[in-house]
């Protein structure tokens, strides 16, 4: 092959994998460079050799082959340059990671080497905080019968979602605030003097929803206001209720259309605000209110109070130090031998306080 300094090599513009050979319109000679109409440069004609293998790029005739040694009598102006073969690189950890949302079944899909998702060790589990039970599209729990069912019915959605997706291990333990700890009982008990009944008030989205204790009716107007719906739609829903009571006198949280407990539960479940109003729809709501009340403090407080400190003027300063020492300190000092080693610093602090009081009394008398 002749060396031409001005020669430029081009990639083929023809389909090299096709069986049909391209016959030139005129015969070319391989002795001198000829003019190329496409590139407007002087190029040299190289023999194009067809192989029986389907991949023509991998099996291209050697460039040093003369036209007389070529097996084919056709000449092509362009030739194919084979791409260099690189050794197969080992898969990165990102390629070995199983992505649940990118897995295509029954296909040869290979994940790219782009770091889409960090590889987590198998002992690390998801805390389940992203499974928010207050999401509007989650399943709503059934009506809670008593307080013992609250610990069972609340994480119902977490179990159903975790069962549907086995790749995600949803647990109730969270490092910070879990999704179930947000739902704390926040009931306010008020007295409705006009109706002579107790009302249970729960706030959601800045609106107080009230439930009566005598007949368990709920203020439907405030209930639907939690959903932020329009006034026309709210009045249309309440107007279609067969059993309702209209209250026009009283506080703002008492005014409105009152509907039965069962109908209010259905509306709250349909509008997906049932979890926001917990524990308003607990049937035994009195037990939750009673559980929040402080226990009897009389059983926790000691029956005998320590004797008051006496300070009487006297000439003897040593007698003052013995009088201002409380009896409780004497009892603790006498029983110090029976206490554990962990309580000794507490007794030492009491003695330091007693010495400070003694020195203060001496300074006042002097």
Swiss-Prot record:
One of its GO terms (biological process) is positive regulation of pseudohyphal growth. GO terms for molecular function: DNA-binding transcription factor activity; sequence-specific DNA binding. Residues 312-328 have a biased composition (Basic and acidic residues). GO terms for cellular component: nucleus. Its main location: nucleus. Residues 294-366 are annotated as: Disordered. Coiled coil: none annotated. Pfam families: KilA-N (PF04383). Residues 186-292 form the HTH APSES-type domain. PROSITE patterns: HTH_APSES. It comes from the Eukaryota. Residues 220-241 bind DNA. It is found in: Nucleus. Keywords: DNA-binding, Nucleus, Transcription, Transcription regulation. InterPro entries: EFG1/Phd1/StuA, HTH_APSES_sf, KilA/APSES_HTH, Tscrpt_reg_HTH_APSES-type. SMART domains: KilA-N. Belongs to the EFG1/PHD1/stuA family. Putative transcription factor that functions in pseudohyphal growth. Present with 1420 molecules/cell in log phase SD medium. This is Putative transcription factor PHD1.
